[in-house]
Structure formats: C-alpha cells, structure tokens
UniProtKB/Swiss-Prot annotation:
Keywords on record: Aminoacyl-tRNA synthetase, ATP-binding, Cytoplasm, Ligase, Nucleotide-binding, Protein biosynthesis
Gene Ontology CC terms, in alphabetical order: aminoacyl-tRNA synthetase multienzyme complex; cytoplasm
Entry's free-text remark on domains: Consists of three domains: the N-terminal catalytic domain, the anticodon-binding domain and the C-terminal extension.
Function: Catalyzes the attachment of proline to tRNA(Pro) in a two-step reaction: proline is first activated by ATP to form Pro-AMP and then transferred to the acceptor end of tRNA(Pro).
Main location: cytoplasm
Claim: Aminoacyl-tRNA synthetase is one of the keywords in the record: yes
This protein's name: Proline--tRNA ligase
EC number annotated for this UniProt entry: 6.1.1.15
Length: 481
C-alpha cells in the first residue's frame, strides 16, 4: 500500500491520474464529459473552491499595488507576430479565429497576453511618473494542446489563468518586482498547503521572449512533477518590439523593462493531489467551501436533536464559520460521513440525543479522523483551534513528503535509477547548455533548472555528463506533466 503525507493510505495513487479523475468527478468538483478535447466543466462545488482561491490571489495582488484589468480574448495577429521568439514559442499552440464571411483580419485566441498588453502600455505610459505599472487579470487562455489532455492539469482552455504584467523604469526595479512576485506565489502556495520547489529554468526551457524564467514545481503522488507557477523577467525584449518608451527624469526617452507571471487551476489540482487520500479530498480549512458539516443523528420524529444542531450551526455562522447542516432524512449518518469526507470538509460536527442531554457536540478531524467531545459553550473556539491545527498539520506533512522525494546523485546512471522511482533528482552541472541537454538525454528526464530555494552548490564535483567540466550548479531533474 502506498502512503502519502500524514501516513494516510493511498493505494489508488499507484495510478494517480485514475485516482485524480475519479475523486474530482465523485466529489462534484469537475466534469470532464464535455465533448471537446481539453475543455471541461466546473461544477458548483468546484466553482466555490475556485472562488475562494481566486479571492486569495486577488487579495495578495491588490495588497502589493497591482490593479485588476480585463482584456479582450482576441489578439490581432499583427501584435502577436511582432516578437519573433515569442511567436516561435507559441505559434504551434494557438487557436486561430476565422470570420464566417471570409474576411482578411486574422485573430488569435490569447495563449497569454504579453502581446495584447504592450500596445496598451504604449498608450498608458508617458513618463517616469507612470511607472511602475502593475496590472493583472484572471481569464481564460487557449492552447492547442497536441499532447494527451488531463482534467485540470493539461487543458486547451485554461479557464483560471491569473496573469500579471508589470512595467518598470530599469532592470533593478523590474527584478525587485520578480522577487516580489516570487514572494506572492510563496504565500499562495503556503496558504493552500502546497509544497514547492523554486528553480531558474534552463535557457532552453525559459518562456518565449523572456530573459529568464523562475518556476514553481510540486511533486505529484506518482513521482512526476507539475509546474504550478512561473515568473518571467522580460527585459526590454517586448518594449523594443512595440516601441514602448517613457520620458525619464534625465529628460531622455528610455525603453521600459517588463515582467510577467502566471498561475492557473493547476494550483487547485495540486492542492487536491498532494493532500487527498483514498477517502477523497482534504481541503485547507480557510479555502474549503464548507468548513464544518453538522450531522444531526435523529431517531423517529423527535425534533430536539435537529433544533439543537441548527442552534449550534447558527452560533458558528455568527462567528464567521462556513457551516452546513445535513438534515436529510433519506440518508443514514454513515452515508453522510462518507459523502462529506469525499468532499474534503475539514471538520464534522455530530449531534445525537446524548449530546443534547450533555449540552455538548462531537468534532471529527478530516485529516486524522480524531474525535473530540466539546462543550457547546466552547464550540466556536474549539472549531477555530481545530481548523488551525488541521492546516498546520497539512502543511507540515506535505512539506515533509516533498523533501523526502528530492535526492542527489553525482552520476547519470544512478540519477536515472532514482528518477525511475519518482521524485526529483539533483545532479552536478557546469551550466553548459549542451551538457545539460546531454544529462536530460542520458537520464530520460526533464530539467527543472537551478535551485533558487537553497544556496548550496556542488563542491569539487564534475558535470554529470561532461566530466571534463567543473560543476557550478545543481541541476534539478524530473519526469513531468
């Protein structure tokens, strides 16, 4: 039996995609039966989860001076084709819009919005007082994926794409923004109990048109990694193409420096994947649509238990807790336990005749299934304490699990064997692109890049594929989605 964070059984995780597809369908998060490849439906419970996550994203961007915008889904081909490296990176993935009348205008469904934003930045930015400019939007983007699509993981319509775009007077200020963006993403992942690795992508895998790319990756239960966020320093690459300049304090015209950074519904997929178990979802309490489900255990026509349960529910609602009373008469308590465990509700509150008599309730944690008898007068404080304990335990256990799946090796044959077991392997690398590609070829893996979440460097080691070269960095390798 496979065990994941917190030692919870994960026998189904031997086939992760099968488990994932089943749980998001059974928990009524997502429906992937829509008859268009790579396009899926968020069901009401999934939308509720998504809205809570989007609120977190908006809060952290708003707090750091970003302003929300909403751009059209169409990008004129004239704009899209201006940056040659960018179009080379995306042209094979774009959807083209053709007019029914056969008109000449060529439009692209946005795959990302750098080329849509820059012409507007040119209109909005006049002098140094207009900088920095920081905007973001949460929208659909479209990629003509030719690989196998997976619900919430590899899509043709990415329907929850948060992209931020910023403009700055110089490289120093733009790179300060890159650091701030990394900090924002750290906070998002931490609050969603998603462990992560931060790496600088190798040049051959950076964003099309970027000077460099920083990426967040997490490890899925099957040992593959998934990219869950990226931050790009774009330098003057786009501003020169679109001729976006500002009047500086020195009275001279200068090109702006830009950044962009994005995350998508993959963060929800990761939150589900790294925390769930054989019973279903386990949601971080602050972002669960329902934080406490109340199960009245009733006998006959006696209404006292139900009235008591609704009274406790009202107290929790007044305290700001998202609570639901499951008072259905056609379902047994056992069925309800299973149902709400599947949906990942963090706390179950049970009320039976003895609880009414004792003026108490019974609380059960979704993460450990420990039970607690609590006096009614203490129920609000107990729920708050339990939600914090659950979140702390989720974060601690998922980080421990991720760290246990990152290993090091100084030679490619051992690295390949470790990669076959799953997880991330770090090998010594000179920094030479050709040697890096050779490492990937020999280990049959993908290069995530150079670790940015540790200052350690190889000591007296040679490049894993080019022994004549001294290693300067660790290179992270994995098999990835």
């Amino acid at each position: 039996m496979v065990r994941g964070p917190q030692g919870r059984p994960r026998s189904r995780w031997v086939s992760f995609i099968e488990w994932f597809n089943k749980v998001i369908m059974d928990a009524e998060v997502y429906d992937y039966r829509y008859p268009v490849k790579g396009a899926y439906i968020w069901r009401p419970y999934g939308v509720a989860i998504r809205r809570n996550v989007e609120a977190l994203i908006r809060r952290l961007h708003d707090e750091t001076g970003h302003q929300e915008v909403l751009f059209p889904v169409f990008i004129p081909y004239e704009f899209f084709s201006k940056e040659s490296e960018h179009i080379r990176g995306f042209e094979s993935e774009v959807f083209w819009v053709s007019k029914g009348t056969g008109g000449e205008e060529r439009l692209v469904l946005r795959p990302t919005s750098e080329t849509a934003m820059m012409p507007m930045f040119k209109l909005w930015i006049r002098d140094h007082t207009d900088l920095p400019l920081r905007v973001y939007q949460i929208v659909s983007v479209f990629r003509a994926e030719t690989k196998m699509t997976h619900p919430m993981i590899r899509l043709r319509e990415i329907s929850m794409f948060k992209e931020a775009h910023t403009a700055h007077a110089d490289r120093d200020d733009a790179e300060r923004q890159v650091k701030e963006a990394v900090g924002i993403y750290r906070r998002i992942m931490d609050e969603l109990c998603i462990p992560y690795l931060i790496s600088r992508r190798p040049d051959w895998d950076k964003f099309a048109g970027a000077v460099y790319t920083i990426a967040f990756d997490t490890i899925m239960p099957d040992g593959r990694t998934m990219q869950i966020g990226t931050v790009h320093y774009l330098g003057e690459n786009f501003s020169r193409v679109f001729d976006v300049k500002y009047l500086g304090k020195d009275g001279q015209m200068h090109y702006i420096h830009t950044t962009s950074y994005g995350i998508s519904e993959r963060i929800i997929a990761s939150m589900i994947a790294v925390n769930g178990d054989d019973r279903g979802l386990l949601l971080p309490p602050r972002y669960a649509p329902i934080q406490v489900v109340v199960i009245p255990i009733m006998y006959g026509e006696d209404q006292s238990v139900l009235n008591y349960a609704k009274g406790v529910s009202g107290e929790l609602l007044n305290a700001g807790v998202r609570v639901h009373v499951d008072d259905r008469r056609d379902k047994t308590p056992g069925w309800k336990y299973y149902h709400w465990e599947l949906k990942g509700v963090p706390i179950r509150l049970e009320v039976g005749p003895s609880d009414v008599k004792d003026n108490a309730v019974t609380l059960t944690r979704r993460d450990t299934f420990e039970k607690y008898a609590v006096e009614r007068s203490n129920v609000v404080d107990a729920v708050r304490e339990l939600m914090k304990a659950i979140e702390d335990n989720m974060r601690k256990s998922t980080w421990e699990w991720l760290r246990s799946h990152v290993r090091r090796s100084s030679n490619v044959s051992e690295a390949k064997a470790l990669l076959n077991e799953g997880g991330v392997v770090e090998v010594p690398w000179s920094g030479d692109d050709e040697c890096g590609r050779r490492i990937m070829e020999l280990t049959e893996s993908d290069a995530l890049g150079i670790p940015l979440d540790t200052d350690e460097t190889p000591s007296d080691l040679r490049d894993a594929a080019c022994s004549e070269k001294k290693a300067e960095y660790w290179l992270r390798l994995s098999r990835r989605y």
